Curated annotation (Swiss-Prot):
One of its GO terms (cellular component) is cytoplasm. This is Acetyl-CoA acetyltransferase. Pfam families: Thiolase_C, Thiolase_N. One of its GO terms (molecular function) is acetyl-CoA C-acetyltransferase activity. It comes from Allochromatium vinosum (strain ATCC 17899 / DSM 180 / NBRC 103801 / NCIMB 10441 / D). It catalyses: 2 acetyl-CoA = acetoacetyl-CoA + CoA. Gene3D superfamilies: 3.40.47.10. The active site is at C89, H350, C380.
Length: 394
């Protein structure tokens, strides 16, 4: 790239709990609110956008190309193309990479990229219903589990991959609960200090009676969480296991997006860049330990950027599970005081198609607050992959 490609604005919805405040809205409706909010904040006209690229994992029965639905619902003209991508938990960050590539290749000037997800509205389906079932029980499948949370190669839940990591690294239940409690406590402190306020775009949720409800604060964090309280929970995936609902991320709803363009375009439009996109990398690992994906992805990304872990001022590494996040921290060897300083997905939540963009949005705003220069966003991916993006404030 001969010219810097930058993010000029970033925003996200507050993250909703499963069947919680956002559950009455589809993924496209949540995404529409965020996209409209970004247009309003930047002052960009809808017709100035060249493309919209959004991650969404749970798309069964939601209609053709959800990103296109979001684009038109947000008031962008028919002439603006849109693409939905599915790289499971890495979808929202890969969308930003695709925006970066499109601009670098001269295929677009301004791209909005990110992700959206309603895990609450994911469908149950009846397999082989076109052929019929002549005898016996006929079971429906939960697409949230099958398409979002189930390892297709080993035929078990993502939680089992976390158990595999805990066994491989020797992480105890107590260590995992302590990690999860710390995440909750950091998020509680951040919420009480208003540290997420700037990044959240409020969403109006229609009510059956009266005025719409304004949803503008993450509702998944459990204030007052301690390692002792987490220690009372039963293992979720194995009778003798150590992974519980308390030391794993949540099932959530939300959306997050960024506005990407060249530095010269930002200057032309009078928009101040939040950061430049420095490098991106994807990597593959054994699906049975999919949570280690950020290790090779982050290593490759840092090599491309010409950085080392010690150069990073701030890191957002998605917490799919405590054991998973601990393995990444251990092998990367980075300064833990710089990682997920306001808590991670164990506390904030993990709307899978949106999380890649969510960690990036959170990273960008916290870098501003701390005057940090170099940052990294990274996530593991079900099926055995990882993604990482390096950014630098200018």
């Amino acid at each position: 790239m001969n010219e810097n490609i930058v993010i000029v604005d970033a925003g996200r919805s507050a993250i909703g709990t499963f069947s919680g405040s956002l559950s009455s809205l589809s993924a496209t409706e949540i995404g529409t609110a965020v996209l409209k909010g970004l247009l309003a904040r930047t002052g960009l006209a809808p017709e100035q956008i060249d493309e919209v690229i959004l991650g969404q994992v749970l798309t069964a029965g939601v209609g053709q190309n959800p990103a296109r639905q979001t684009t038109l619902k947000a008031g962008l003209p028919h002439s603006v193309p849109a693409m939905t991508i599915n790289k499971v938990c890495g979808s929202g960050l890969k969308a930003v990479h695709l925006a970066m590539q499109a601009i670098a290749c001269g295929d677009a000037d301004i791209v909005i990229a990110g992700g959206q997800e309603s895990m609450s509205q994911s469908s149950h389906v009846l397999p082989r219903s076109r052929d019929g079932q002549r005898m016996g029980d006929w079971s429906m499948k939960d697409t949230m589990i099958v398409d979002g949370l189930w390892d297709a190669f080993n035929n078990y839940h993502m939680g089992t991959t976390a158990e595999n990591i805990a066994q491989k690294y020797g992480f105890t239940r107590e260590q995992q609960d302590a990690f999860a409690a710390a995440s909750q406590q950091k998020t509680e402190a951040a919420q009480k200090a208003g540290r997420f306020q700037d990044e959240i775009i409020p969403i109006e949720i229609p009510q059956r009676k009266g005025d719409p409800k304004v949803f503008d604060a993450d509702e998944f964090p459990r204030h007052g969480t301690t390692a002792e309280s987490l220690g009372k929970l039963r293992p979720a995936f194995s009778r003798d296991g150590s992974v519980t609902a308390g030391n794993a991320s949540g099932i959530n709803d939300g959306a997050a997006m960024v506005v990407v363009m060249k530095e010269s375009k930002a200057k032309e439009l009078g928009l101040k860049p939040m950061a430049r996109l420095v490098a991106f990398a994807s990597a593959g690992v054994d699906p049975a330990i999919m949570g280690t994906g950020p290790i090779p992805a982050s290593t490759k990304c840092l090599e491309k950027a010409g950085w080392t872990p010690a150069d990073l001022d701030l890191i957002e590494a998605n917490e799919a599970f405590a054991a998973q996040a601990m393995s990444v921290n251990q092998d990367m060897g980075w300064d833990l005081s710089k990682v997920n300083v306001n808590g991670g997905a164990i506390a904030i939540g993990h709307p899978i198609g949106a999380s890649g963009a969510r960690v990036l949005v959170t990273l960008l705003y916290e870098m501003q607050k701390r005057d940090a220069k170099k940052g990294l966003a990274t996530l593991c991916i079900g099926g055995g992959q990882g993604v990482a993006l390096a950014v630098e404030r200018m």
